[in-house]
Amino acid sequence: MMKKLLLLLFIVCTSFVYAQENWGDLKKNKLTLKEIPPVWPGCSGSAVEKEHCFNQELSKHIMSNFTYPTQEYNNNIQGRVVVSFKINTKGFVEIKNVRGGNKGLQEAAKTIVLKIPKLTPGMMGGKPREISMSVPFNFKTNKK
């Protein structure tokens, strides 16, 4: 009986301690939604593991698909090309901008990016979201 009385007393006392009449202005509170980046096919695990896997797979993709345009190589045309693109809400790549280098180098870089496989799209608030990215390409012939 004494235990029940002490428990009841404890519950009553703690309810007074935590009771609040004024919750404050809810408009001042902000909810921050975390952006979840796209996921490369076959990548799994924690967010950090998926991001690491994505970066590794993208690097492998670039290395295995990289070709130096023949005309540019033969003429010792070199340069840095940056391809800006987005992964749309369906997981496909859409080129936004290609800058640097000449037309041939730009087309080669663009082709590599367009060969990226369908990804699991990025998410925010549980909904698919377009995610923008940029990838630099350095074209060097190592000729003198």
Sequence positions of predicted segments:
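N-terminal secretory signal peptides that target proteins for export/translocation
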Residues: 1-2
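Charge-biased low-complexity segments
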Residues: 6-7, 17-144
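Repetitive helical segments and hydrophobic/amphipathic motifs
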Residues: 12-13
